[in-house]
């Protein structure tokens, strides 16, 4: 009996937690996820080190007006001789700070309101759902423009808070719907039966099952916040003395860079916006593939060998034998 049990569990077998660890690392194995994380890490590095590695002061003027890219000015210069490359480097920090801060505040609000409404139910659900519906129907960008116009200093913090307050409602509705489907699960009922408190049930039973939804909402909010901040800077609502990619585009458009043929003034900022948006979208796609098994199955099914149409395996006599012993797919069924 002991020999059989020893044989059933080999010495070199991995611990029971190995499949769980592999499942957790599956998210990082995807090509989309890795590509998105590499691009995002590059921009984070620029945001951290940009002001120190910038070759020039982004506000410093010179006599080299509207010069194309060269060894001295990699991205060319503006109409006042300012270095575009230095402006892009310094502006990267403002873009990521506003995007990440706004997404963090909006995600915290959506988790707090959505999960509380879905789990508690009753009057709490009705009040919080009504609050979410009010913010859903409010036009986000016009409201941000109005708020920014009444604030004397529209810095990164003000813009991030304004974006967060107008972008949490849709995530809250999604989390409420997911929580409604989770609160009657067997493990949640078992936690209630053992006397667990409501905050502990939410923290240890509900939120771990909403991690992927929360992460996807966070990435989506970062994309929305980045585009909103750049839009506000481009139309001149945000403080144009704070450098970001939208500020670069604002000055390029105000001084008719396109009409003057100064493509180097606006193309680098546009490419940075496209690359950052692509990176965040790839990360979001990776989260979807990690959460949705159907997407992983569809990706893997493309590698399967397809049967030849019109031919089916039939039995053939093996050489030297008098009975069918081999199969062939070269003969059509008669």
What are the language-model segments listed below?
Residues 3, 11-59, 131, 200, ...:
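N-terminal signal-anchor/first transmembrane alpha helix
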Residues 24, 48-86:
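Short membrane-interfacial helix/loop motifs at transmembrane-helix boundaries
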Residues 74, 105-109, 118-185, 213-215:
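Generic hydrophobic transmembrane alpha-helix motif, especially the helices
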Residues 84-119, 275-276:
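Transmembrane alpha-helix signature in integral membrane proteins
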Residues 93-109, 199-231:
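Transmembrane alpha-helices
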Residues 136, 147-151, 179, 220-221, ...:
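Glycine-rich helix-loop "coupling/hinge" segments at transmembrane-helix boundaries
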Residues 166, 212-215, 219-220, 262-329:
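C-terminal transmembrane helix and the adjacent membrane-cytosol boundary/short C-terminal tail
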């Amino acid at each position: 009996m002991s020999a059989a049990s020893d044989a059933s569990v080999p010495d070199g077998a991995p611990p029971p937690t190995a499949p769980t660890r592999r499942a957790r690392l599956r998210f990082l194995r995807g090509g989309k996820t890795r590509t998105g994380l590499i691009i995002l890490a590059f921009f984070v590095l620029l945001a951290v080190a940009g002001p120190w590695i910038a070759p020039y002061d982004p506000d410093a003027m010179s006599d080299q007006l509207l010069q194309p890219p060269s060894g001295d000015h990699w991205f060319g210069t503006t109409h006042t001789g300012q270095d575009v490359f230095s402006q892009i480097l310094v502006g990267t920090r403002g873009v990521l700070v506003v995007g990440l801060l706004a997404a963090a505040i909006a995600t915290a609000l959506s988790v707090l309101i959505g999960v509380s409404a879905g789990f508690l139910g009753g009057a709490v659900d009705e009040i919080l759902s009504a609050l979410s519906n009010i913010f859903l129907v409010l036009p986000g960008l016009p409201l941000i423009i109005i708020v920014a116009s009444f604030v004397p200093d529209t810095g990164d913090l003000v813009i991030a808070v304004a974006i967060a307050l107008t972008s949490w409602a849709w995530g809250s509705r999604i989390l409420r719907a997911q929580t409604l489907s989770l609160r009657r699960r067997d493990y949640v009922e078992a936690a209630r039966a053992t006397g667990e408190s409501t905050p502990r049930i939410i923290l240890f039973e509900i939120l771990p099952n909403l991690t992927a939804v929360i992460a996807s909402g966070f990435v989506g909010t970062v994309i929305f916040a980045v585009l909103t901040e750049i839009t506000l800077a481009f139309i001149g609502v945000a403080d144009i003395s704070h450098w970001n990619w939208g500020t670069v585009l604002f000055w390029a458009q105000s001084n008719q860079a396109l009409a003057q043929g100064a493509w180097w003034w606006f193309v680098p900022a546009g490419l940075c916006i496209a690359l950052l948006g692509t990176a965040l979208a790839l990360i979001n796609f990776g989260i979807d593939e990690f959460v949705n098994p159907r997407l992983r199955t569809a990706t893997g099914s493309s590698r399967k060998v397809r049967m030849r149409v019109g031919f089916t395996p039939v039995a053939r006599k093996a050489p030297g034998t008098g009975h069918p012993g081999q199969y062939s797919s070269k003969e059509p069924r008669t």
